């Protein structure tokens, strides 16, 4: 099985070219199949069911071809990954037998689509002898992928598969369609609820996965009595507990201490914090002299010089609360304090006080 005419670099380059060409063809054929589905929906809406079935058979073949191209793409990737084995070993490695034989078998069937695939097959035949290549092309060696052979076969797709394609196309485009009851009755037991089975004749027996571009999938494998077991649910991952900060012991009372501080002493009440800020010194003096009339508050007052200091203190106290200045408050300071000189009120200039009072009112 040893050949002497292999060119390793040429084989490597063409394997990469085959992969790129296959990816482009898969994308192109998938887009064309999507457009063809819209045409089939129009046929169903117009009542042309037979014509729609013919078009669906063509779509199924294209989907099979896309799946076959995906399989070949994987085999080319495998050969590139193990290219060192191909170069170093004289005999064919058992792990590469299926990949090599499948590529040689598919080359004459897809060389019109992918011309580089024929070059790859010729290089592999040069490496492992022409006799080996002949055995692979006829599958006499028995290592060609059976699923790929099914996808590239010339047999017509099953009727039940055609009906399922039509049902799904009608559902996607909201077109009324009544499937053929005779064909649906011939479906194998246990597969009636399946959406689309792209090869339930061979692939279900082998359990091979469906990777087609037409939305196909593999039906579950049936038992000896023809029944299909229910699939086991996937184990759900355990949710991760999110991190959370510890909650506070209780809400706080803005008028006192936090709630719960004095629960052990029910007879003791926390001191209440006044809602208003503490006022200046003369408030107590004003409350102490409640019986003084308004005329006495304004009349007897100090000389013009002392009121300047209490006025500035009053302004500093109420700056943060945006309260207007009260002109009458500073006049009470000397009268409320004990031992104040009451005779000084005779020297007060009432005209001057009135003028200043009016000016203060205008400012506020």
Swiss-Prot record:
<keyword id="KW-0132">Cell division</keyword>
<dbReference type="GO" id="GO:0005813">
    <property type="term" value="C:centrosome"/>
</dbReference>
<dbReference type="InterPro" id="IPR005061">
    <property type="entry name" value="Ist1"/>
</dbReference>
<comment type="subunit">
    <text>Interacts with CHMP1A, CHMP1B, VPS4A and VTA1. Interacts with SPAST, STAMBP, and USP8. May interact with VPS37B. May associate with the ESCRT-I complex. Interacts with MITD1, in competition with VSP4. Interacts with SPART (via MIT domain); leading to the recruitment of SPART to midbodies. Interacts with SPAST.</text>
</comment>
<feature type="compositionally biased region" description="Polar residues">
    <location>
        <begin position="334"/>
        <end position="345"/>
    </location>
</feature>
<keyword id="KW-0539">Nucleus</keyword>
<dbReference type="GO" id="GO:0015031">
    <property type="term" value="P:protein transport"/>
</dbReference>
<keyword id="KW-0206">Cytoskeleton</keyword>
<feature type="modified residue" description="Phosphotyrosine">
    <location>
        <position position="43"/>
    </location>
</feature>
<dbReference type="GO" id="GO:0008104">
    <property type="term" value="P:protein localization"/>
</dbReference>
<dbReference type="GO" id="GO:0031410">
    <property type="term" value="C:cytoplasmic vesicle"/>
</dbReference>
<dbReference type="InterPro" id="IPR042277">
    <property type="entry name" value="IST1-like"/>
</dbReference>
<dbReference type="Pfam" id="PF03398">
    <property type="entry name" value="Ist1"/>
</dbReference>
<dbReference type="GO" id="GO:0051301">
    <property type="term" value="P:cell division"/>
</dbReference>
<protein>
    <recommendedName>
        <fullName>IST1 homolog</fullName>
    </recommendedName>
</protein>
<comment type="similarity">
    <text>Belongs to the IST1 family.</text>
</comment>
<keyword id="KW-0963">Cytoplasm</keyword>
<comment type="function">
    <text>ESCRT-III-like protein involved in cytokinesis, nuclear envelope reassembly and endosomal tubulation. Is required for efficient abscission during cytokinesis. Involved in recruiting VPS4A and/or VPS4B to the midbody of dividing cells. During late anaphase, involved in nuclear envelope reassembly and mitotic spindle disassembly together with the ESCRT-III complex: IST1 acts by mediating the recruitment of SPAST to the nuclear membrane, leading to microtubule severing. Recruited to the reforming nuclear envelope (NE) during anaphase by LEMD2.</text>
</comment>
<feature type="region of interest" description="Disordered">
    <location>
        <begin position="292"/>
        <end position="352"/>
    </location>
</feature>
<keyword id="KW-0597">Phosphoprotein</keyword>
<dbReference type="GO" id="GO:0030496">
    <property type="term" value="C:midbody"/>
</dbReference>
<keyword id="KW-0131">Cell cycle</keyword>
<keyword id="KW-0968">Cytoplasmic vesicle</keyword>
<feature type="modified residue" description="Phosphoserine">
    <location>
        <position position="4"/>
    </location>
</feature>
<dbReference type="GO" id="GO:0005635">
    <property type="term" value="C:nuclear envelope"/>
</dbReference>
